[in-house]
């Protein structure tokens, strides 16, 4: 039986509330689960203690039994200091693409050329007056 520690959605429309559960991976997301391990309320502020509550002893028990945490649960465990932080695969996601870099370079070149042109004009007028 492939076990997962994952989120099961509850709450009403536009007001999500999640249970952290240990369940068989073949069961539906909000369906049958084996044990409730905690709760997650995304509507609370990030620094609130009630945002994520987990029974760490039971979570460790299920991890020892071979249950695989989902990505979000593994992030919760990392934030709690229960597991070491892993490298993420999308390190370049925040960097701009090639065309955006080219446009930024062109814009910078035009701005520097425009800044140099007015600076040269008064210098040329001063030289012409002498």
From Swiss-Prot:
Q: Which UniProt keywords apply?
A: Ribonucleoprotein, Ribosomal protein
InterPro entries referenced in this protein's UniProt entry, alphabetically: Ribosomal_bS16 (IPR000307), Ribosomal_bS16_dom_sf (IPR023803)
Ribonucleoprotein is among the record's keywords: yes
The cross-references to Pfam families, in alphabetical order and at most eight, read:
Ribosomal_S16
Q: Name one GO cellular component term.
A: small ribosomal subunit
Q: According to the UniProt record, where is the region Disordered?
A: 80-130
Q: Where is the composition biased (Basic and acidic residues)?
A: 99-109
Q: Where is the composition biased (Low complexity)?
A: 110-130
- SUPFAM superfamilies listed in its UniProt record: Ribosomal protein S16
Name a single GO biological process: translation
GO molecular function terms attached to this record: structural constituent of ribosome
> Could you confirm whether the keyword Ribonucleoprotein appears in this record?
yes
Xref: Gene3D superfamilies: 3.30.1320.10
**Family designation:** Belongs to the bacterial ribosomal protein bS16 family.
Designated name of the protein: Small ribosomal subunit protein bS16
């Amino acid at each position: 039986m492939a076990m997962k520690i994952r989120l099961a959605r509850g709450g009403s429309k536009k007001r999500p509330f999640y249970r952290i559960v240990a369940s068989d991976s073949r069961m539906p997301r909000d369906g049958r689960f084996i044990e409730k391990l905690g709760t997650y309320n995304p509507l609370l502020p990030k620094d609130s203690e009630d945002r994520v509550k987990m029974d760490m002893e039971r979570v460790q028990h299920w991890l020892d039994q071979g249950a695989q945490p989902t990505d979000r649960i593994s992030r919760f465990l990392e934030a709690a200091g229960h597991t070491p932080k892993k490298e993420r695969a999308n390190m370049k996601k925040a960097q701009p693409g090639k065309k955006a870099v080219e446009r930024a370079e062109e814009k910078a070149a035009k701005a520097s050329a425009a800044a140099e042109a007015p600076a040269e004009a008064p210098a040329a007028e001063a030289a012409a007056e002498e």
